[in-house]
């Protein structure tokens, strides 16, 4: 039995990964044998070959655990982190997906790295999130929270969106485009990168605005301070608008309502192994060339 700075650990994942079964079982038994209380997300509880596990949903894990281990890819991490960011809990991922920008641990060496992490040897990194709100008259409603990005688009391919963008109530530009991506540094390596946006190091306190297929070549990606409030206004004759936060369920917007995006009060409390390096991670994930000099 080994001492751990974490008293209760949540194991989170999704059963769509066939190779997750062994990872779940091995990880659970390893933690259990160390005398650590383990809570399993209910979606994955059937993957275990034991009935001794404590079962709970993401909110239960957020309430009772002080570390969550997410098994899967970045999509699974985003799903879990969207809920867990509301709680005081640290998160790390075992990568069973493709790129895995947010899931650091290789399943083959995960237990070695986790052993060091349980002893307190890790890098702690806090990532900020974005809230999206709408205002209708004097009523303000939070529609969702994004770890990666907020995406504004229309459901019809033939129609472009026209909007005016304001930063801190100052008119900045108007645009006709297929949509707009508003990304955090965490999301700058996702859809925003594919749309021509820059990569932001997680330590950069910035928000990336990336027009999607703009009608004018002068409409370029820009980076603004993450303390800024972004607001979007639309003309009355506007096709049906849709918003997605981290590719979650679509949110349909009334064009007569003003949209606001700003930094959330919640954070994503990530931890990494001590040997983690963001730029080495980028080089591996994006296939950048090795040193040639």
Swiss-Prot record:
SUPFAM superfamilies: NAD kinase/diacylglycerol kinase-like. Keywords: ATP-binding, Cytoplasm, Kinase, NAD, NADP, Nucleotide-binding, Transferase. It is an enzyme of class 2 (transferase). Its cofactor is a divalent metal cation. It holds the Pfam family NAD_kinase_C. GO terms for molecular function: ATP binding; metal ion binding; NAD binding; NAD+ kinase activity. NAD(+) binds at residues 74-75, 79, 148-149, 176, 178, 189-194, 248. Its EC number is 2.7.1.23. It is found in: Cytoplasm. GO terms for cellular component: cytoplasm. Belongs to the NAD kinase family. Involved in the regulation of the intracellular balance of NAD and NADP, and is a key enzyme in the biosynthesis of NADP. Catalyzes specifically the phosphorylation on 2'-hydroxyl of the adenosine moiety of NAD to yield NADP. NCBIfam families: PRK01231.1, PRK03378.1. This is NAD kinase.
